[in-house]
Amino acid sequence: MPNNVTLHIPNLIKQIQADFPDITFEAGSHFSWHAKTRHVSYLPDADDPRSLWALLHELGHALLNHTDFSSDIELLNIEVAAWAEAHRLAEKYGITIDQNYIEDNLDSYRDWLHVRATCPTCYERSLQIDRQTYRCH
């Protein structure tokens, strides 16, 4: 496959569809993986390197069979795994993913997790009890 300069979303989609025919790709308003319907949504007009990286990241979720998560830390682990898979795919397709972009993306999850795990009363870290509830310890 060509490098980032000449590789465009439509070309990458065609190649990915040939390589992974069990996954459907649908134009949408954002990049996302839909486990129930086994399809990846993508921005059809996006044509920058970050869009290529996002597409590979969502494909990573698909190939790793990510469906759901039961805790916030599990979500973070799923995101890390999807980016690792995107890295592997990028090599296959001759794409270089900026590691700083990946870390910035993961930092947004880490920051979100930190806020959710901080008790609003005492500002100490708390423990997640279920998907929606944290308990101060």
For every predicted segment, state its role:
Residues 2-6, 10-51, 62, 66:
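Active-site scaffold of zinc-dependent metalloenzymes
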Residues 73-137:
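Metalloprotease/metallohydrolase-associated module, dominated by Zn2+-dependent proteases
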Residues 57, 61:
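Histidine-centered divalent metal-coordination motifs
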Residues 49-54, 100:
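Alpha-helical scaffolds flanking conserved acidic
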Residues 65-74:
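Substrate-binding clefts and substrate-entry loops adjacent to catalytic sites
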